[in-house]
Amino acid sequence: MSQTVLAFDFGTNSIGCAVGQSITGTAQGLPAFKAQDGIPNWEQIGKVIAQWQPDLLVVGLPLNMDGTEQPLTQRAKKFANRLNGRFNLPVELQDERLTTVEAKSEIFARGGFKALKKGKVDAISACLILESWFEQQS
């Protein structure tokens, strides 16, 4: 059974978003959400959830390279809990180590410095989070 999944790359100023299907295992970036000190516009997130009707949400979990938690880890977990509480959808956490670095190098390879716009980085990071989640499911 194919699932539609939305993924989020949590940040204090911007939250990347991507949508994907489990049947293809691929993700497509969506516009990033602005956030103020980690608090998103929940109405905008609600509209995206209503539009895509996901079966599941995935939130990137920022960890240090050694696997220990960093200051942003707890905030990402809190964001995941709030998604679950507000939208009554299952939420899973996905290790996101190196996704931002990987996203920046992918964007730079395609378009140089001009292409390194923050929203694009967040969207591609969310795609990488979702695609790595799909890989772990298979």
From Swiss-Prot:
It comes from the Bacteria. One of its GO terms (molecular function) is nuclease activity. It holds the Pfam family RuvX. GO terms for biological process: rRNA 5'-end processing. InterPro entries: RNaseH-like_sf (IPR012337), YqgF (IPR005227), YqgF/RNaseH-like_dom (IPR006641), YqgF/RNaseH-like_dom_sf (IPR037027). The keyword Ribonucleoprotein does not apply. SUPFAM superfamilies: Ribonuclease H-like. GO terms for cellular component: cytosol. Its main location: cytoplasm. It is found in: Cytoplasm. The keyword Cell membrane does not apply. CDD domains: YqgF. Keywords: Cytoplasm, Hydrolase, Nuclease, Ribosome biogenesis. Could be a nuclease involved in processing of the 5'-end of pre-16S rRNA. Belongs to the YqgF nuclease family. This is Putative pre-16S rRNA nuclease. It comes from Glaesserella parasuis serovar 5 (strain SH0165). The lineage of its organism: Bacteria, Pseudomonadati, Pseudomonadota, Gammaproteobacteria, Pasteurellales.
